[in-house]
Amino acid sequence: MSIAKALVMSDLHLEHGNKITIPVIDGVKFLILAGDIGSNQSHLEFIKDCASKYTVIYILGNHEFYGFTLKEVRDFWKSVKIDNFYFLDNSSVVIDDIEFIGSTLWVDFDRQNPRIMLNASLVITDFRKIYNATADEYITVDSIYREFEISYNYLKEAIYNDNGFKKVMITHYGFSHESVHPSYRDREADLTNNHCYTSNLDYFVGNSLVNVAIHGHMHTSADYMLGDVRVVCEPVGYPDTLNPEFHFKVVDLK
């Protein structure tokens, strides 16, 4: 039986001027883009080029929403019709007996810890860049926690559904603090900020029916196991702070 393979990456941040050419790799069918590729629709031509080379699975990061409402960005990408392109937003698609399950996920702020939520509201740029329902109202920590709940409840149904397919879960936000780079695990400020980037869902993911779980957002590479689930994060990063470990990583999905 052939092994399905995917080129996995996130956080290309094309809106900041990164120039990335996606190579064609023999034997690789899928390209998984785990969010923060660009801002709203600015990277549409990049997506079209990717879809000419691979079957593309794409989810939104937080940066795609900058300058727009949540609904505007979601509606745009739902409207995009490109061959070999699949946009997932609390949704899934089955290709070659693999169920790709996608969600931005967002974050639970250490289970709604008031101290973490206050810190996030002060230091996280999203709350001054992303609009909620209208252009007169920014998102808040409370509204993003509600987004997290919606995503979590969707994923709970999807990743525990024994429907016979191999499962690949793709989120933008992290779901385990194991993805936090060791250099960000000691200082108190880092420990506080980490809860703004990833939730602690180790048991939830590690005991699921997922084969591979992919995320972005952290800007440092990770590849480890949660139970029987392989976790992969392969971000590019900002132009002035590129991830030195980034490479064109190919992952076996089955």
Where do the protein language model's features map onto the residues?
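N-terminal active-site segment of His-dependent metallophosphoesterases
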Residues: 1-59, 64-73, 134-137, 254
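Binuclear metal-dependent phosphoesterase catalytic core
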Residues: 2-3, 94, 181-187, 192-210, ...
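A basic- and aromatic-enriched beta-loop-alpha substructure that forms the phosphate/nucleotide-
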Residues: 56-64, 69-132
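A structural motif corresponding to the C-terminal end of an alpha-helix
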Residues: 81-85, 154-166, 203-213
